């Protein structure tokens, strides 16, 4: 448990990458394997990962991710890899469960697989950042994603040039209770 807590504590959202240093295919493969073994409601695995490492296409995806008006996400241009997470249709059991319980289990599952992915990246000593703010229509068009599919996340990965920073978290007493709220 000590090793896992160390890994989780070390992982941060990195927003500065070495654009000249590519991510090794072997590392990327292990990261994707870790993401694919994440648990999901009724084992539906409602995700598809599109790995963008072609420099020209990556820059076009980064353009769709950054916002000039708000000054957001310009760092995505530096990242050598973008992993787009596309929501797939859940299996019948998970879909019915989502409807009955009024919870989108697919979105929860994608959050879990994203956590696996970024922790695996950290274990490979790679920086990552989960980006949810992007022009989904542009991304869908760039990557030939069918119109009925949702692109939920763009996870950028690369060798971080950002220094480690201390975690700012609420005190455990604020977020944990036992037996009652």
Regions found by a protein language model. Name each.
Residues 4-8, 13-14, 91, 153-181:
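C-terminal helix-cap and adjacent tail motif
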């Amino acid at each position: 448990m000590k090793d896992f807590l160390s890994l989780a504590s070390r992982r941060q959202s990195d927003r500065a990458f070495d654009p000249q240093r590519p991510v090794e295919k072997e590392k990327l493969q292990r990261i994707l394997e870790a993401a694919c073994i994440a648990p999901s409601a009724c084992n539906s695995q409602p995700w598809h990962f599109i790995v963008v490492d072609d420099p020209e296409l990556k820059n076009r995806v980064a353009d769709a991710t950054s916002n000039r008006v708000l000054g957001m996400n310009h760092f995505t241009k530096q990242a050598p890899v973008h992993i787009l997470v596309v929501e797939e249709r859940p299996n019948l059991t998970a879909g019915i469960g989502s409807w009955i319980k009024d919870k989108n289990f697919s979105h929860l599952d994608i959050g879990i697989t994203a956590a696996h992915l970024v922790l695996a990246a950290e274990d490979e000593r790679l920086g990552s950042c989960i980006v949810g703010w992007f022009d989904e229509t542009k991304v869908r068009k760039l990557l030939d994603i069918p119109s009925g599919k949702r692109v939920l996340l763009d996870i950028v990965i690369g060798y971080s040039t950002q220094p480690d920073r201390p975690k700012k978290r609420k005190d455990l007493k604020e977020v944990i209770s036992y037996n009652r709220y």
